[in-house]
Amino acid sequence: MGVITRDGLDWLKDKLIKAGHVDTFKLEGVKEDRKPVIGGGLSILYALFDLLGIEEMHTAQGALRQGVLQDLLGRLENHDNTDLRGTMVTALASRFAVDLAQADRVKRTALWLFQNLQANLNKKASRLIQLENKLSWAAQLLEIGTRISHSDFHKHGAYILDNADLTGFSMPELHRLSQLILGHRGKLKKLEPELRDHEFVCQLISLRLAAILCHARREPDLQGFSFQQSTQSTEFAIQCTKSWSQLWPQSVHLLQEECDAWLKSNWQLSFQISSGV
């Protein structure tokens, strides 16, 4: 990879001055149709070096796509209409024939659960919106791996996202989504590094519980069901009424298994059935 320095800029400026005109300027590797823009590009680089105090610049493997600054500004101001990521997620879900009704159920349930944890996260509203968006996208793409195989589909889905090229997403963002999908079921040991991040844990536990509550692929019954994080930030608590547990015995069984899964991590999940109706 090449490196641009001030000495290099001075050398190029001298070559341009000696040439007198772009038509007579010669430089190995420069195509004829690029010559007219060299002077302007050199001026911009000089200004950047001076204004930003840059000592050297390294060339990158890619380039900024058209409109990326407007896209990033829209994200900061939470303007959904300028953020391409949601559009890309929808397109990817369609490409892998995701059950959109189920994805929507899981998404809405995960967001409802996550909103119960936001007080303990103690984050600004703009940051909470960002976390909700990423949780929504993970829920929408939860089942993309089923197109490959229903066995270990969460692993296939994580692999797809880790290797996808989705406009608007950075590689770290895609990896975070892949880890949410990978961890939405099964053992938590595979996510030990990520479980040090409180934000990630709140997203993950919301997604795992949403998948459980929507396991029958129908609208979950959230009446008589509550979820919160205790004042001790490593403990989460589920509570349901006795009548809820009687109506949904399979969900109760799955939730109890979920509590056992979290026992093997640094985070704890409890499940209590109240004596009330």
Segments and roles (model prediction):
Residues 1-217, 223-238, 242-246:
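Helical "lid/coupling" subdomains associated with nucleotide-phosphate turnover
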